[in-house]
Each structure stands twice: as structure tokens, then as C-alpha cells.
């Protein structure tokens, strides 16, 4: 069973991503939901996952800060409302870069790339 971490600071966006993942990949297990850089770093230090769905702008910083604090080898599907981070995203384990609001078809295509 694939385990994933959902990193999102907006509850509505979290609920929507979770709903789409449950529909598209019911066999994937949500290990945790984190909303900050600090929560994510602490979680990843102790809990390996197979995939991360990672919002770029978080309440306590930029999600790229995570990669500066710990070594992350987990594949990442980035989500953001902004497109200026695309180049940076592909330098750190990026499977795909999805603009919000994330469309189900786009998430499905990203999951297929991951698999």
C-alpha cells in the first residue's frame, strides 16, 4: 500500500485534495496532514512515505525550506496557486507541478507519472 503525506495550510484545499485522492487512488493511505514547514520536517524525520502532495506556500514559509532542513528523497507532486516556482520545483524530486485549483484530471496524470 502506498503511503502519502498531504502538506497544505488551507483546510478547504486539504479536504479537496483528500477527496480526489480517495476517489482516484482508494488504495493509497493518507499517513498525515501537515500544514507548516516545521510540522512537515518533524513528521518526515520519523515517518517515511512513498509520495508527498506539497503546497508551496505555507503559513510559516516556503515548502522549499523543507528540502533545506532535511534530506528528502520522496517524490513530490507540488500544488500552488502561483506558477513562479516551477523551475525550483523540478530541482527537488518533483513528479509534477499543479496549479490550484487542482483539477482531477491533472492530479490523475501526475499520479500516473509517479507510478
Predicted regions, residues:
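Charged phosphotransfer/docking patches of two-component systems
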Residues: 11-15, 86
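Conserved acidic carboxylate
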Residues: 8
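Short, flexible, glycine/charge-rich loop motifs used to bind or transfer phosphoryl groups or to couple energy/partner
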Residues: 21, 42-43, 65-67
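Acidic, metal-coordinating helix/loop segments flanking the phosphotransfer/catalytic sites
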Residues: 18, 33-51
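Short hydrophobic helical patches associated with two-component signaling proteins
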Residues: 16-21, 107
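Extreme N-terminal starter segment of soluble prokaryotic enzymes
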Residues: 1-4
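CheY-like receiver
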Residues: 51-115
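A generic structural motif
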Residues: 25-30
Amino acid at each position: 500500500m502506498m503511503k502519502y503525506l498531504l502538506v497544505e495550510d488551507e483546510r478547504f484545499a486539504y479536504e479537496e485534495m483528500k477527496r480526489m485522492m480517495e476517489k482516484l487512488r482508494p488504495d493509497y493511505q493518507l499517513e498525515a496532514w501537515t500544514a507548516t514547514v516545521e510540522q512537515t520536517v518533524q513528521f518526515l524525520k520519523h515517518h517515511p512515505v512513498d509520495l508527498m502532495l506539497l503546497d508551496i506556500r505555507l503559513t510559516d514559509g516556503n515548502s522549499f525550506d523543507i528540502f533545506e532542513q532535511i534530506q528528502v528523497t520522496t517524490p513530490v507532486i507540488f500544488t500552488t496557486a502561483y506558477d513562479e516556482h516551477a523551475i525550483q520545483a523540478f530541482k527537488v524530486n518533483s513528479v509534477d507541478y499543479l496549479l490550484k485549483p487542482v483539477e482531477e484530471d491533472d492530479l490523475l496524470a501526475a499520479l500516473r507519472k509517479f507510478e
